[in-house]
Amino acid sequence: MFGGAKPSFGATPAATSFGGFSGTTTTTPFGQSAFGKPAAPAFGNTSTFAAQPAQQSLFGAAATPAQPAGGLFGANTSTGFGSTATAQPTAFGAFSQPQQTSNIFGSTQTAASTSLFGQSTLPAFGAAKPTMTAFGQTAAAQPTGSLFGQPAAATSTTGFGGFGTSAPTTTNVFGSGTASAFAQPQATAVGASGVNTGTAVAKYQPTIGTDTLMKSGQANSVNTKQHCITAMKEFEGKSLEELRLEDYMCGRKGPQAGNAPGAFGFGAQVTQPAQPASGGLFGSTAQPSTGLFGQTVTENKSMFGTTAFGQQPATNNAFGAATQQNNFLQKPFGATTTTPFAAPAADASNPFGAKPAFGQGGSLFGQAPATSAAPAFGQTNTGFGGFGTTAGATQQSTLFGATPAADPNKSAFGLGTAASAATTGFGFGAPATSTAGGGLFGNKPATSFAAPTFGATSTASTPFSNFGLNTSTAATGGGLFNSGLNKPATSGFGGFGATSAAPLNFNAGNTGGSLFGNTAKPGGGLFGGGTTTLGGTGAAPTGGLFGGGTTSFGGVGGSLGGGGFGMGTNNSLTGGIMGAQPTLGIMTPSHQPIHQQILARVTSPYGDSPIFKDLKLSSEADATRATNPAAQQAVLDLTSNQYKISTSNNPAPMKVKALGSTLNRKSLFDGLEEFDASVEGFNLKPSAKRLVIKPKVKSVEGGNPSSSIGSAPNTPQSRPKGATPNKERESFSGAIPSEPLPPAGNSPGATNGRESQDNGRRESWLHPNNLEKVRQHNIQTGMDQGSPHNSTLNELVPRKPLDTYRPSSTVRLSVSTIPENPFEDQSSTIARRETFTSQQANESVLSNRSNEAEDSAANQSRLAIEAAAAEAADDESHPTGIVLRRVGYYTIPSLDDLRSYLAEDGSCVVPNFTVGREGYGNVFFGKEMDVAGLNLDEIVHFRNKEIIIYPDDENKPPIGQGLNRDAQVTLDQVWPLDKTKHEAIKDPQRLLEMDWEGKLRRVCDKNDTRFIEYRPETGSWVFRVKHFSKYGLGDSDEEDELPTDPKKAKIATLEAQQRANAEKMTLNSLRQAQKISEDAARNLDPKALVAGVASGFRPMDDTAEFLLMDKTQFFQAGGNSDFSMFDPPRQRPTITSPTAVLAQEMVGNEAHKMQLMKSSFFVEDNAPEDEPMETTGRLLRHRKFFNVEPLVWKDGASESSSQYDFEHPSPALPISSSVSEASLMCDAHYEETSSMATGSIVAAVKETKFEMPVTKAFKFVCKPKVAPIKLRATTVPLPRSIAYEMRDNWIADLGFYKGRSFKLSFGPQNSLVLPSTYNNMQNLKEFTGPSLPVSMVFAPRSATDLSPSVMQLVEFNMVKGNEGFRESIIPHLEVQLNDCLSVNVEGSECPCIHPDSGTKLVSKHFSESLKQRNAGLKEDYSVSVWSLLFALWGDHDELVDLEKNSHYMVMCRRNLLSEWLENTLLGKDLLSKKVSTHSYLEHMLDLLSCHRVNEACELAFSYDDANLALVLSQLSSGAVFRLLMEEQLFAWQQSKSDKYIDLERLKMYMLAAGAPMMQSSHGAINLLENKNWLTALALQLWYFTAPTSSITDALNAYNDAFQAEECYAEPPKPSYRDAPTDTKKPVYDLRYHLLQLHSKRMHSLEETLNPITHTADAMDFRLSWLLLQTLRALGYRHCSPLTEARLSVDFASQLENEGLWQWGIFVLLHIKQQTQRERAVQQMLQRNVSVSAKVALYAEERFIVEELGIPMSWVDYAKAVKAGASGKHHLQAKYLLKAKHFATAHDVIFQHIAPDAIINGKMKYLHSLLIQFEDTEGSSIRVPNWANQGQIFLDFIDISAKFKQIRSVTNIADINARWENLKPQLSELCSRISLLPCPTSKHRLCQSEISQSLSCLVHGMCIVCPEMESSTVLKVALERLPLPQEFASKELRIWLEELLDKIQNEPPFSERQQPTMMEI
């Protein structure tokens, strides 16, 4: 396996790759050559692999000599685990050195043969020789050793023994009968509970069977389940009593939580048999007081049933060997030792640290013996830093980092190094003073690669400190998790004998212990020490991993500690991994991840209670399903009770339920599971069940983000220039509400906002320190500590002094100046956001403050308010009268810029006015408006996710004035709130998944606003409003909406409709109500109405109380009441209908009352006017909900009208009415949502006045009234309709919402059908202008237009005619046609065209474009483009025979581009412009910008400026001149002399120096400023780049100029004015793209050919398509086929719209894909060919056939299609036959032509069509149904023709011959005529005509051929021919006459000749 021969379990092999395991010191991976030291055994024992050891066992037990044999690790007499073996070779060949009798664990065995682990007579684990496999065989009954050497009983055993065996004395790994695995005997296997009897044999499961059920008289097979344990096959032979008795005998009398076997049987309850004489784990003598790792024996039982875990042996280790005071692993497991984990040992008897194999005498983890040598993994000069780098003069380290002593036979893993030399590789307890590093995972700390990771020396610790076992040195640290306590203790894994300092950093202070938490002893054991590990926090002993006595993974100290997996730790309830009672371990809920707890709460809200275990959450939709048992029972009950007769005299009870608004029922834990569990372990988040009260400490200076009291503004401007608004103060940081602001000064109680927020998340406010902080803050801010409110949790909320909220009497409070409590919910203060001018109103607003707050005054806050008010009053008013002093608010244009808009008359008309607030949003007014005199502080208010303009409705101007107009609102930071983390959700992907934008859209629809967009990056919500009130996202909008599942949504919709119907009021109650004067209403006490005292009517709810208040009372009560008109809808009281109120009032459930309630829906509309009714004279004053003007409804049915004006007294019910006033008022409020005026029919309402006595109730029992419905002759305009007043509630009624809307849809030929009015149509007819304006076509109904509605059909010319289009494009298309190649594609009739390669197209297009110069802007631009193409790619005389990439070619192209730039930039009047002395410098600069250097020098000479002319003459001369000029400019700059030089002159000097930018005394000078992109590129080419640079160099320099972060050049925008700026990618000029394409061949052709790069008409593709073909000819073919095809199709459509469809086909032939090309050409042909019976081909059709090669059959088929669409079926058949589409032609002929031809007798025409099917070979065969359709017609025509020929023949013989030839054909046709399909009546007529003709032919044949029996022939003809009834009757009569004649002419029967016998 490792390189040697592969003997099978014992054969002697040759040398292996391990090298030195046969007695000689050969080179092996673990020998000297591999690791630098002599060959040694692998695990440090000479008996292990090759050398002669001193008879030492694996764990240090002395072995006696015996016969030589070879085991797995070199033991000759033992098996792999201790049984004696013979001296045969081992399985690995090289392990054959004869050894002594000592086994791997030190016990002496007799000799035997070698098996898998070194013996043959004994099995693999020391048992008797098996008869089967090694795992589970039946052993012979000889007393041989078990798995670990102990003698086995003569019983059978399984492979691992102890997984359910029945023999109590089984020999196995963990549970033999001789001795247990850990030095104690046990009766059963590990994990077994004895013999499985009783109910433990098998797990209980219901028994599934079948049965027969009789249903409806038929037997049906059904599945059954028997819920009884005796029905199971395992228990079918026993009764319940027998099973119970067996369970009792086994000790099972209840739930066996502690007795169930674990994964490996840990925790199984076993019995205690007699202890045998021997029993260590591996064969050593068992001691009565040994534990696994050396702890003191106590009476507590181990989880293995004996004392294996938890008992401390006196002298023996776990494996039966005598303990010695050696180093680690040279002592028993658990024995106390004087050496720490990694300290050096006294001798080298341990197999992991002995001299042989890998080093002389070292322990496993680095103890060193006396000598020193290079370690196995620690030799010098290794390549990797962490694997043994050179240690210099220091000692070399081991595998785990320990420095070895002078040992020649060093262990491979450094086992045996001195513990004081270095820290180990994993930090196992080395001191912190070692200088030697290295080893497998760590090298020298100062120089190595992996110094601090594994094994480096550290004064603190290694990264994995607490798994490292530190020495007892006081200052040393190190360990797996960086624990560095200096108190010596046991190791982190406990029990390996070493001391440890606070393992795992999870506890501190518990002395002694182990990983698994056993009680501390002087030397802790692996599973039982005193040190708490992995999470223990207490000092008392708690549970170990397996239920020991100390705190472990999950222990929290004291007596509450649990086992590692949540198991109990009490000795009486000794727990195991899987079997103890859970307390507070790792798996307890308190230590489970929060997300798992949340999911458990959501999925199982009732927990694990057995009462609710079967109660599952189900949706309401499931209740109605047929599979629901409850629904089935309901159906059964319904059907069973349907025909029962009740004997009771009482009417059937009816339960009436009031209809109200349904509450939003939500689970308490909904939304908490949104948190991602995958990152749960890496986030520190609060508990989901803990109340976290976040402090919002704000000083007076800090203020509230929504108020301006905190700090006075510095300036009246909205935003000072250069100053950045306070982001922290005015914007949100993701938390809602926003975090506390830092105070301006060191005021008492000020805290940092971010710090307080974090503390609120991580600390409990119930902590004493936090409580003390809050109390101190409240004391410092003036709060009364002895207040009764401060004795509860209320004291946890830091509060401001209450005088902060009490305004000064001199300050006028508004919405912007009234401070709000930062600790209140902001939604509760919305009702107080009104502007009040009176002090009384101000007091009423603040009346809800507590008495304590009013008693405590804060002078500091009052002084701050007064100072702010005084400072604001002292500020200089703005000239425009605009008031804006609040911090954070701004305007665009700014207040300073608005001064320039001020007119002489005082107005300030500003376009695009914007008002905003930093961090909250802005409002944009797009139209011009007068902003003079606006007090923006009182008008505009931005809040969190909302905007309020004109909060006071009374001061709001009409729509269109002031700021109450159409505007665009942007609200920033509108993000939803994460319920789990209490933070805003900003992830765009998560916002998309939760459809946040859709929710905002629905809010916009709800508020009658138009949604524009949502930007998730900034949370900006943009929408447009028509007028202003309050807009935003309220608290109710933030709540989760109804489920989006289609089924649930349907149910939710039905519920919403039911609620809406319940909330709608009927007008009947108002029509029956009396009208009471307003004066009497003032005398009515609202409190009396509410209390119902001395009035005789039911008390009202809060709604009616508010309705009866006047304005002042309403706002005074608004602060103390829960009801407010400005509160969210969810805070308002439930609105119920009058019927629901009646239902609430009814006592009992009598059916009579239900009938009364039903009859209330049919109350008479009009009460008799002659019935006087009494009234009390009292009036009810209603609060105005809406300003409704008087409305008039008129129709043809009635002339009556009804006026509703809520400003006047509304109809009210009598006081004695049983309908409550609350319902009436709510009805009046919700009247606008009723469906009184649905559709176009509105019932007439008659205005009546009638009085009702106080004691008289409603007249409920009335007969329904039937009113005829008549169409109205007039239509009420929407502004005058009552529906207009309900526009805010239209969303609740689709009849209103869509009642006045109409969907526009375009029809054929760009026609549009839309509604209009009769008057508008008259105006259109009377219009006499040249072109009809679109506004008149779409004119709405005016306010005075009552004319009926009409429908109008309008046709539009969708594409505006392009003048000169034909003249500009046809020459270029002809050029393209002449230079293209037509290729015939195999398998296709359609050719493919592509341009010819070369530069000819460039030259020809350029020449053609020059002819069109000055024809228009597009033509001029086209000339510029083609000239640029000619300069970059065209053929020039000087470029003939030059290499493309030669320098001369590059310079020539540069000169050509320079020439093109000069011609393009040169203005028409630049050279002829007149200049003066003052302007010549500027003119010179213009000349230089066009590269007119000579003209500029001449101009300088003319003005005696010779020096400047000399400088300009050297432009572009080279680098030396530019350097000199640059130095000169720098000198002028340093001496400040440049301020005396003209700016234009300096710019020219900068051109000479080649510097585009310079800092001077004039400021920053940018030569490219305000220059278009062509000029900037030209300056780069001419002056800034080297004269020898290429076009690419100049282009790159320009790219750097405009693409840099601080760009100083204009980007290459298109030349047309309205260049798009809102595209995702910037749009650049076409010429710039061509330059890029010349410089970079793979530049995107898709971007280059986009029409918007050169024209504002995105549908103009002519130049783009021509460029595509030209570039393809030049070799640029990397454009995608899809883009090419799309561009060709678009350009062809443009040509088609211009009437050039033939050229459109030419364009379509350039499509590469064959199928797309053919389909596009055929479709265009079908749309544009002309159909004429006279003209075969028109000129365009001849062009496409002759010039373009379109097949004629395509043209014919296109004409056939167009003829068919036009109804010209004869032409259609003609063209189909020419196109050889015979099947289609046959169908057309049969459907439309043949019946008419037969009926009308046009046989020749029909024959000319049908004969073409016969003439063409095989055509009739390819036509389906030819035999029963076309063939019948053709045969009938042939027979008719032959009959006519017979009639012209005079020869009798010839006639008879012809008739004989006609007989078969006639007979066959008579048989097939009935098969002719007759889809229409015309076809049936045609069939009858043919049948009649055939009948006549039959008669003629009978006449001509008298020998034929006419009667027989006629009979046959009548049977076969489908004749009409009349004709058949006529023929039958004729046949009967002939038959009678025949009978009469025959002789009598007696005279007939009798037949002879021969004849018979």
Swiss-Prot record:
Membrane topology annotation: Peripheral membrane protein
Chain intervals with Basic and acidic residues compositional bias: 755-768
EC number: 3.4.21.-
Repeat positions for Sequence: 2-3, 9-10, 18-19, 30-31, 35-36, 43-44, 59-60, 73-74, 81-82, 92-93, 105-106, 117-118, 125-126, 135-136, 148-149, 160-161, 163-164, 174-175, 264-265, 266-267, 282-283, 293-294, 304-305, 309-310, 319-320, 333-334, 352-353, 358-359, 365-366, 377-378, 384-385, 387-388, 400-401, 413-414, 426-427, 428-429, 441-442, 454-455, 467-468, 493-494, 496-497, 516-517, 527-528, 546-547, 553-554, 565-566
Active site per the UniProt annotation: S1029
Stretches assigned to the Peptidase S59 domain: 886-1028
Tissue: Expressed in brain.
A GO molecular-function annotation: serine-type peptidase activity
46 X 2 AA repeats of F-G as annotated region, ranges: 2-566
Induction: Up-regulated upon Drosophila C virus (DCV) or Sindbis virus (SINV) infection.
Cellular localization per UniProt: Chromosome; Nucleus, Nucleoplasm; Nucleus membrane; Nucleus, Nuclear pore complex
Post-translational modification: Isoform A and isoform C are autoproteolytically cleaved to yield Nup98 and Nup96 or Nup98 only, respectively.
SUPFAM superfamilies: C-terminal autoproteolytic domain of nucleoporin nup98
PROSITE patterns attached to this UniProt entry: NUP_C
Record-annotated site: Cleavage: F1028, S1029
Top enzyme category: hydrolase
GO biological process: cellular response to ecdysone; cellular response to heat; germ-line stem cell population maintenance; heat shock-mediated polytene chromosome puffing; larval lymph gland hemopoiesis; male germ-line stem cell population maintenance; mRNA transport; negative regulation by host of viral transcription
Role played: Part of the nuclear pore complex (NPC). Required for MAD import as part of the Nup107-160 complex and required for nuclear export of Moe probably via its association with Rae1. Plays a role in nuclear mRNA export. Promotes cell antiviral response by up-regulating FoxK-dependent antiviral gene transcription. In germline stem cells, involved in their maintenance and division together with the TGF-Beta and EGFR signaling pathways. In larval lymph glands, has a role in the maintenance of hematopoiesis by regulating Pvr expression.
Free-text domain note: Contains FG repeats. FG repeats are interaction sites for karyopherins (importins, exportins) and form probably an affinity gradient, guiding the transport proteins unidirectionally with their cargo through the NPC. FG repeat regions are highly flexible and lack ordered secondary structure. The overall conservation of FG repeats regarding exact sequence, spacing, and repeat unit length is limited.
Family: Belongs to the nucleoporin GLFG family.
Subunit relationships: Part of the nuclear pore complex (NPC). Interacts with Rae1. Nuclear pore complex protein Nup98: Interacts with pzg and Chro. Interacts with MBD-R2; the interaction allows Nup98 recruitment to chromatin. Interacts with Trx. Interacts with Wds. Interacts with Mgtor and Cp190. Upon ecdysone stimulation, interacts with EcR, CTCF, su(Hw) and Trl.
Name of the featured protein: Nuclear pore complex protein Nup98-Nup96
Native species: Drosophila melanogaster (Fruit fly)
Chain's gene name: Nup98-96
